From Swiss-Prot:
Active uptake of hexoses. Probable glucose/hydrogen symport. The keyword Transmembrane helix applies. Residues 1-22, 472-510 are cytoplasmic. Gene3D superfamilies: MFS general substrate transporter like domains. This is Hexose carrier protein HEX6. Belongs to the major facilitator superfamily. Sugar transporter (TC 2.A.1.1) family. Keywords: Membrane, Sugar transport, Symport, Transmembrane, Transmembrane helix, Transport. Its main location: membrane. The keyword Transmembrane applies. One of its GO terms (cellular component) is membrane. It comes from Ricinus communis (Castor bean). PROSITE patterns: MFS, SUGAR_TRANSPORT_1, SUGAR_TRANSPORT_2. GO terms for molecular function: monosaccharide transmembrane transporter activity; symporter activity.
Length: 510
């Protein structure tokens, strides 16, 4: 059963509709976002639970409870504690490069399946952990699972989606991340109240639920037409899949573009080497800059350490976990709004509006903490809740801009021949700087104090200017015709030069 409108775009015209088949397939694949979000949300919650700290990080617990001389900003400063959070991202960084080869050679579906299965094993290990080494090894396995899922799922969504709805469908990945984080916050809030001090085990083990859904569901996922054509000469099979995906038999124009892209793809033996060529310079810059900027918004500081941050400003354990639920709800709601408007307003407008909103909120939070929170004692409850409101405003700005668009834009800009390699670079850069931010934040909070918010606010100014000057609009442009936006851009057309134009002319003549 198909529903929707004909797909048209500035870059060309394809026939087709948004089908229930595509919607269900993308919903299942987007469970890869849920496992990622759950893991982001659960770590901050359990590290604020007293029984968890007493068992695995007794030095942190002692500083928090007994050492009255330690600054509010330094109570949680522990490299071992941050290693628990950040170890996942080192593993994910390494895994993403292996995932690139699997995704290119065997398809998007096997990478999603493998990611779900490894994540499932790690969730079991984390819930059963008896020492800190077992705990961190479980996090490493979770990182491998997330590395494979994050490499394959955004590609899957972009390739399955009609151009008209690609933004909304791909933003479903970030929406799923938000749902996962919110679920973790709700579970943390409930398990913290369990008597006996073992609630953290439930929090960690519950990650197995979305992982099991993803693993089982991946068995039934169809492969994308792009991947079928890239990996074989069976164009008839790809055509049948494309007809099913688009809900129409008239898919020849899109099929021809996929075949042309595949011909170029097969001439590329070393995609990581070829992505360095001048003709791919815009995509390479975006593959590095966008995930880097996404991390230095400071959002994962809120996601990882929100309960710790709220305890720093004087909220109790339950109140800090409840505050994390509030920010999670705001983030999920704003990402859902982004899904509805991204293909109407475009990517650039949301990036810029969200950047301004985040900057204002961060500066105000930093100012309040600088004025009201000293090294000892808390701040008034009134100010604490003002900080919470401002953080919600900041999270909302991220939720409809850099959150979903940080995954959407990189996944839609790469030509087929370097798409898998390009997405691996995106994931690796994201994990690298997530690791750096996660590993250094508690120390930075200790040394910068309230200045940490001004630090991240400065980066928001830089990234907003970057988008304004260097990112072209990509809404509704077919994914295999995306080279048009670079050839027409005032700056990038000077960079890619004649090489890209000549090769494009050859492809069109083929």
């Amino acid at each position: 059963m198909a529903a929707g409108l004909a797909i048209t775009s500035e870059g060309g015209q394809y026939n087709g509709r948004m089908t229930s088949f595509v919607a269900l397939s993308c919903m299942m694949a987007a469970m890869g976002g849920v496992i990622f979000g759950y893991d982001i949300g659960v770590s901050g919650g359990v590290t604020s639970m007293d029984p968890f700290l007493k068992k695995f990080f007794p030095d942190v617990y002692r500083k928090m409870k007994e050492d009255t001389e330690i600054s509010n900003y330094c109570k949680f400063d522990s490299q071992l504690l941050t290693s628990f959070t950040s170890s996942l991202y080192v593993a994910g960084l390494v895994a993403s490069f292996f995932a690139s080869s699997v995704t290119r050679a065997f398809g998007r579906k096997p990478s999603i399946l493998l990611g779900g299965x490894v994540f499932l094993a790690x969730a079991a290990l984390g819930g059963a952990a008896v020492n800190v080494y077992m705990l961190i090894f479980g996090r490493v396995l979770l990182g491998v699972g997330v590395g494979f899922a994050n490499q394959a799922v955004p590609l899957y969504l972009s390739e399955m989606a009609p151009p008209r709805y690609r933004g909304a469908i791909n933003n479903g990945f970030q929406f799923s991340v938000g749902i996962g984080a919110l679920s973790a916050n709700l579970i943390n809030y409930g398990t913290e109240k369990i008597e006996g001090g073992w609630g953290w085990r439930i929090s960690l083990a519950m990650a197995a639920v979305p992982a099991a859904i993803l693993t089982f569901g991946a068995l039934f996922l169809p492969e994308t037409p792009n991947s079928l054509i890239q990996r074989s000469n069976d164009h008839e099979r790809a055509k049948l899949m494309l007809q099913r995906v688009r809900g129409t038999t008239d898919v020849q124009a899109e099929l021809d573009d996929l075949i042309k892209a595949s011909i170029i793809s097969r001439t590329i033996q070393h995609p990581f080497k070829n992505i360095m060529r001048r003709k791919y310079r815009p995509q390479l810059v975006m593959a590095v800059a966008i995930p880097f900027f996404q991390q230095v918004t400071g959002i994962n500081v809120i996601a990882f350490y929100a309960p710790i941050l709220f305890r720093t400003i004087g909220l109790e354990e339950s109140a800090s976990l409840l505050s994390s639920i509030v920010t999670g709800l705001v983030g999920s709601a704003s990402t859902f709004i982004s899904m509805l408007i991204v293909d109407k307003l475009g990517r650039r407008a949301l990036f810029i509006f969200g950047g301004v909103q985040m900057f204002v909120a961060q500066i105000m939070v930093g100012s309040i903490m600088a004025a009201e929170l000293g090294d000892h004692g808390g701040i008034g409850k009134g100010y604490a809740y003002i900080v919470l409101i401002l953080i919600c405003i900041y999270v909302a700005g991220f939720g409809w801009s850099w959150g979903p668009l940080g995954w959407l834009v990189p996944s839609e800009i790469f030509p087929l021949e370097i798409r898998s390699a390009g997405q691996s670079i995106v994931v690796a850069v994201s994990f690298l700087f997530t690791f750096v931010v996660a590993q250094t934040f508690l120390s930075m909070l200790c040394h910068f104090k309230s200045g940490i918010f001004f630090f991240f606010g400065g980066w928001v100014v830089v990234m907003t200017a970057f988008v304004h000057f260097l990112l072209p609009e990509t809404k509704k442009v077919p994914i295999e015709k995306m080279d048009i936006v670079w050839r027409d851009h005032w700056f990038w057309k000077k960079i890619i030069g004649e090489e890209a134009a000549e090769e494009n002319n050859k492809m069109e003549a083929a």
